[in-house]
C-alpha cells in the first residue's frame, strides 16, 4: 500500500490499490474467514468508490492507503452493520405498553418455547396423529377457543383486518351490510371499515348518526339484499355525552327475525375481566356469542397478549364457509404463529395466573408503589454516573395501553426523568440511549427524557444497560 502521496489526480487514481491486492493482504484474512470473500469484496468496493470520490473532490488519498489498519477498522464497522439484525430487542419505556412501532405484545416464556420447538423440529401442523390422516392447521386452536369462548368453531388468520375481510367476503360478498355511522372506524394507516367493505365486494349501508343510532334505524335499513348487520367495537376512540347505541342482544333478536346475520369486529379483543388490573372491562367474544352474534373477530396481539393474528369465532356452518373461502389460504397463519397462539390461549385456562405468565398482564398488574421503589433504586445508582451533565428525578406519570386499545384509560406509573444540566443535551442523550446494545426508547417531553418504569422487564438488566450508557458519556 502507498506511503507517498502523488500530486496529480491521475497519479492518485493509479496509487489506489487494486481489489486483488487488497484481498491478498494478510490484514484482511480474519475478515475473509469470518464473512467470506463476496461480503468483504463488496465492502472494499464501497471503500474504493469513496476513495475515488475523495480524489475527485479533494485531490488526496484516504488515510487508509498509508495505514492498512484503518481500512481494517472501516471494514469491521461496515460488515458488522451489514450482518447485524434490525429486528432486535429494545427497552420499551415509552409509556405505551402495546406500542405498535415496537412490536405490540411481548410473548410469554411458554409461547417462546413453543415457537422454538416447532422451528427446530417437524410438527403435525396439518396431520392428525391419532387418525394418521391429514388434518386442519386451525385444529390446535379450535379446542381451546371452544372452551374459552363457547364458540362452536374458530378460524385463525394473520391479523384482525384480515379476519374482517375474510368474514365479509365469505358471508356478504355482493350484498349489503348495515353499520352504524358511529362505528365506521379507521384502524390505522388510513385503513377504514368502508375500504374493507369495498374490497370484500359488499355494499355498505350507513345508519344512524355519529353519536346516536337506534334499533329502528337498523330495522328500516334491512332489505331483501341485506346479508348482515355489523357491529364494530370502537376500541381506538370513545364518544361520550349525548349518545345512543343498540346492544348486541337486541340486534341479535332482530337479525334472527329477519333472517340475516349479525357479525362483530371487537378490534383489540380480550378474553378476561381487565378491571382487576385497573382497566375498563372490554366486550369479550364469549359475551358477544351469548348475545346472539353469529361471527366475532378480534386480534391476538393486543389485549390478548399473543402473536399477531386475527381470530374469528362463531357457528360451525359459518366458520366452514370461511375455511373453504379462497382468501383463507392467502391469509392463513404459519406454524410459528399458531404455536405461540396456542401457548398463549393455554394461559387463559387459569385466569388467576395471567399476571404471572403473560408479560402484558404483568405490566398491567404492577402497582405505582412497586414502580416507585424500582425508580428510587435506579436513581440512586445512576445519578452519580450522569452528573454533572444530567440530573435525575422521579415523577408520577400515566401509562397508556396502546395499539388502539382503551384510549381514555391510563394506569398510574413512575417515570425516571433525565434533565439536561451543565453542557448536557437531551437530544444527544436520546440518541445515545438508542445506540445502546439494547436500545432504550423513552419519551421526550419539553424539558425531560422520561423512562416509564412500567415497561421494565428486568430491573438489574436495565440498570446495567443505563450504567454502561452513563459511563460512556
UniProtKB/Swiss-Prot annotation:
Necessary cofactors: pyridoxal 5'-phosphate
Gene Ontology cellular component annotations, sorted alphabetically: cytoplasm
GO MF terms held by the record: L-seryl-tRNA(Sec) selenium transferase activity
Pathway linked to the protein: Aminoacyl-tRNA biosynthesis; selenocysteinyl-tRNA(Sec) biosynthesis; selenocysteinyl-tRNA(Sec) from L-seryl-tRNA(Sec) (bacterial route): step 1/1
Residues that span the membrane, as ranges: none
Residue numbers of N6-(pyridoxal phosphate)lysine PTMs: 302
Record localization: Cytoplasm
A biological process from GO: conversion of seryl-tRNAsec to selenocys-tRNAsec
Top EC group: transferase
InterPro entries, per the entry: PyrdxlP-dep_Trfase, PyrdxlP-dep_Trfase_major, SelA-like, SelA_trans, SelA_trans_N_dom
Predominant localisation class: cytoplasm
Catalytic reaction equation(s): L-seryl-tRNA(Sec) + selenophosphate + H(+) = L-selenocysteinyl-tRNA(Sec) + phosphate
EC number, as in UniProt: 2.9.1.1
Keywords, in A-Z order: Cytoplasm, Protein biosynthesis, Pyridoxal phosphate, Selenium, Transferase
Family affiliation: Belongs to the SelA family.
Function noted in UniProt: Converts seryl-tRNA(Sec) to selenocysteinyl-tRNA(Sec) required for selenoprotein biosynthesis.
Protein name per its UniProtKB record: L-seryl-tRNA(Sec) selenium transferase
Underlying gene: selA
Amino acid at each position: 500500500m502507498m506511503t507517498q502521496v502523488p500530486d496529480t489526480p491521475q497519479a492518485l487514481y493509479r496509487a489506489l490499490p487494486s481489489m486483488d491486492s487488497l484481498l491478498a493482504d494478510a490484514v484482511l484474512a480474519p475478515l475473509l474467514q469470518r464473512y467470506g470473500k463476496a461480503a468483504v469484496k463488496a465492502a472494499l468496493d464501497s471503500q474504493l468508490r469513496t476513495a475515488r470520490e475523495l480524489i475527485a473532490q479533494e485531490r488526496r488519498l484516504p488515510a487508509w492507503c498509508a495505514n492498512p489498519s484503518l481500512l481494517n477498522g472501516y471494514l469491521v464497522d461496515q460488515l458488522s452493520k451489514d450482518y447485524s439484525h434490525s429486528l432486535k430487542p429494545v427497552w420499551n419505556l415509552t409509556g405505551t405498553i402495546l406500542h405498535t412501532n415496537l412490536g405490540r405484545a411481548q410473548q410469554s416464556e411458554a409461547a417462546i418455547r413453543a415457537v422454538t420447538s416447532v422451528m427446530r423440529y417437524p410438527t403435525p401442523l396439518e396431520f392428525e396423529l391419532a387418525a394418521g390422516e391429514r388434518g386442519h392447521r386451525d385444529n390446535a386452536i379450535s379446542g381451546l377457543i371452544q372452551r374459552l369462548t363457547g364458540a362452536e368453531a374458530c378460524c385463525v388468520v394473520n391479523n384482525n383486518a384480515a379476519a374482517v375481510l375474510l368474514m365479509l367476503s365469505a358471508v356478504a360478498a355482493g350484498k349489503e351490510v348495515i353499520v352504524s355511522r358511529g362505528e365506521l372506524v379507521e384502524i390505522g394507516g388510513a385503513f377504514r371499515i368502508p375500504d374493507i367493505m369495498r374490497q370484500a365486494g359488499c355494499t355498505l349501508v350507513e345508519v344512524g348518526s355519529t353519536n346516536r343510532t337506534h334499533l329502528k334505524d337498523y330495522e328500516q335499513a334491512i332489505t331483501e339484499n341485506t346479508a348482515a348487520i355489523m357491529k364494530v367495537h370502537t376500541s381506538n376512540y370513545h364518544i361520550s355525552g349525548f349518545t345512543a347505541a343498540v346492544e348486541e342482544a337486541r340486534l341479535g333478536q332482530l337479525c334472527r327475525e329477519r333472517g340475516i346475520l349479525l357479525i362483530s369486529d371487537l378490534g383489540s379483543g380480550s378474553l378476561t375481566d381487565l378491571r382487576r388490573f385497573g382497566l375498563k372491562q372490554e366486550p369479550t367474544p364469549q359475551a358477544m356469542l351469548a348475545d346472539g352474534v353469529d361471527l366475532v373477530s378480534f386480534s391476538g396481539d393486543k389485549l390478548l397478549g399473543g402473536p399477531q393474528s386475527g381470530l374469528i369465532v362463531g357457528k360451525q356452518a359459518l366458520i366452514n364457509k370461511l375455511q373453504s373461502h379462497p382468501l383463507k389460504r392467502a391469509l392463513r397463519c404459519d406454524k410459528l404463529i399458531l404455536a405461540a397462539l396456542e401457548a398463549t390461549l393455554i394461559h387463559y385456562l387459569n385466569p388467576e395466573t395471567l399476571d404471572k405468565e403473560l408479560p402484558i398482564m404483568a405490566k398491567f398488574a404492577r402497582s405505582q408503589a412497586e414502580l416507585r421503589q424500582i425508580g428510587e433504586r435506579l436513581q440512586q445508582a445512576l445519578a452519580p454516573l450522569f452528573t454533572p451533565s444530567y440530573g435525575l428525578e422521579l415523577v408520577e406519570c400515566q401509562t397508556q395501553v396502546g395499539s388502539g386499545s382503551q384510549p381514555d384509560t391510563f394506569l398510574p406509573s413512575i417515570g425516571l426523568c433525565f434533565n439536561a444540566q451543565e453542557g448536557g443535551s437531551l437530544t444527544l442523550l436520546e440518541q445515545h440511549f438508542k445506540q445502546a446494545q439494547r436500545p432504550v426508547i423513552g419519551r421526550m417531553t419539553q424539558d425531560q427524557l422520561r423512562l416509564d418504569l412500567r415497561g421494565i422487564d428486568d430491573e438489574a438488566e436495565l440498570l446495567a444497560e443505563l450504567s454502561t450508557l452513563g459511563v460512556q458519556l
